[in-house]
């Protein structure tokens, strides 16, 4: 089977995370008799996968006509055209359904029927804060309503967790970008966890609903640790030393900080993730991370986890173990098996 994967050569961080598991498993694809290329040639392909950032310039310029023309050209070169994104679980580019056969998403709602409702702010948690606390965004928007046919095209892909989130990741990414030389992640050397929290998440968004969520966490954690942004070097040094790592929602539910926390063997403190379905499933409540409430986060809750912090050591270990197992491609074929299920689904 011949598969072409189209990405933006500027290698946006999400794009790099999209192709990373393919690159570390590249030789293993021979087991599936799959040939993968990243440049479209004159020949036709069984499947073409298009990363959403492939059209980033056209999306930014609102050049819908050029996007439509490209989709039509690509459709002539393949039996199956698949659009892929790693955006928030509810966000869907509804306008491209008419051009594609399948829509691959790195995270989807646990209940797909949610796609049939207009959600405030295009996220389940922004809908929650709007409805319960009447938080209003300056520029209000709602998620698109999808019909059953459109929902049937949505398939769970893979999130951006299988990638390099170490301190030197930006160097290795640029080596691949400019020299096409791929270097796999180095092992992390752990040091004593002599700091209680790392919570460097202070940031303002142009969405009141998102800011409301983050401010809830800011009020609690600013009493216990510094939350202002610091240099990359200082941040990673702090991460190595920290027992707990705090990662609230941002533009989406899944954040790079989640994977950095798993990699550096912290106990990930994160808002409850049970509302989404994602692969790999890093978010197993009270086993790989410690879920926190979307509201009613209070000092009593915090004092409980601080007082009993030794009870959570296993969560840090399990989160780290569960995260790293997807990188051992010589003994484990998790990504290969998941990729094969996707291929079987779209070709059945």
Predicted regions located by residue number:
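Catalytic binding pocket for nucleotide-activated donors in carbohydrate/polymer assembly enzymes
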Residues: 229-347
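Nucleotide-sugar donor-binding catalytic core of glycosyltransferases
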Residues: 2-38, 42-256, 269-285, 330
């Amino acid at each position: 089977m011949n598969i072409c994967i189209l990405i933006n050569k500027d290698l946006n961080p999400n794009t790099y995370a999209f192709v990373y598991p393919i690159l570390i498993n590249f030789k293993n694809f021979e087991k599936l008799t799959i040939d993968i290329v990243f440049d479209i040639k004159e020949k036709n392909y069984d499947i073409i996968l298009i990363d959403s950032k492939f059209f980033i310039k056209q999306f930014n310029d609102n050049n819908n006509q050029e996007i439509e023309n490209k989709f039509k050209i690509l459709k002539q070169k393949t039996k199956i055209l698949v659009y892929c994104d790693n955006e928030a679980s509810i966000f869907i580019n509804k306008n491209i359904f008419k051009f594609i056969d399948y829509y691959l998403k790195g995270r989807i709602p646990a209940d797909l029927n949610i796609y049939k409702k207009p959600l405030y702010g295009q996220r389940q948690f922004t809908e929650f804060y709007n409805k319960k606390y009447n938080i209003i965004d300056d520029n209000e928007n709602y998620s698109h309503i999808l019909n059953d046919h459109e929902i049937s095209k949505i398939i769970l892909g893979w999130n951006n967790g299988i990638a390099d989130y170490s301190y030197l990741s930006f160097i290795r990414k640029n080596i691949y970008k400019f020299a096409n030389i791929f270097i796999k992640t180095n092992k992390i050397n752990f040091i004593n966890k002599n700091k209680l929290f790392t919570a460097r998440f202070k940031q303002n968004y142009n969405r009141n609903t998102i800011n409301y969520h983050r401010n809830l966490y800011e009020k609690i954690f600013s009493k216990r640790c510094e939350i202002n942004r610091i240099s990359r070097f200082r941040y990673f040094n702090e991460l190595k030393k920290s027992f707990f790592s705090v990662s609230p929602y941002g533009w989406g539910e899944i954040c790079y900080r989640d994977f950095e926390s798993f990699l550096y063997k912290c106990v990930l403190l994160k808002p409850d993730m049970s509302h989404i379905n994602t692969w790999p499933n890093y978010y197993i409540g009270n086993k790989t991370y410690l879920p926190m409430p979307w509201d009613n986060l209070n000092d009593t809750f915090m004092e409980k986890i601080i007082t009993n912090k030794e009870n959570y050591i296993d969560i840090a270990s399990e989160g780290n173990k569960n995260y790293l197992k997807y990188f051992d491609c010589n003994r484990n074929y998790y990504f290969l098996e998941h990729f094969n299920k996707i291929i079987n689904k779209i070709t059945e």
